[in-house]
Amino acid sequence: MADELIVVGGGAAGMMAAISAAETGAAVRLLERNPKVGRKLYITGKGRCNVTNHCPPEEVLASTPRNGRFLYGAVTRTPPAWVEDFFTGLGVPLK
């Protein structure tokens, strides 16, 4: 029997966690209180759903209004090419 996992929250992180767990063979249930998952992603990039940014990590951190340091690990460990490969590997076309 496959491992069973519940992911609470259908935002960007929750969706990526659910997809990654499912790719390992886990039976995943994603719970979201809103009618659609990824709601905030829909409004980024003027409705085009920005999934990454090609700015240097230092620029991303400097442009974060409050305490950008908390993003350091995520920004430095997930370069734009990795994010793009993740989505294209799922069959999501990117512009």
Question: What kind of feature is each model-predicted range?
Answer:
Residues D3-L30:
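N-terminal Rossmann-like FAD-binding beta1-loop-alpha1 element of flavoenzymes
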Residues P35-K95:
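Conserved N-terminal/central alpha/beta ligand/cofactor-binding core
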Residues A2-D3, T88:
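A general secondary-structure boundary signal
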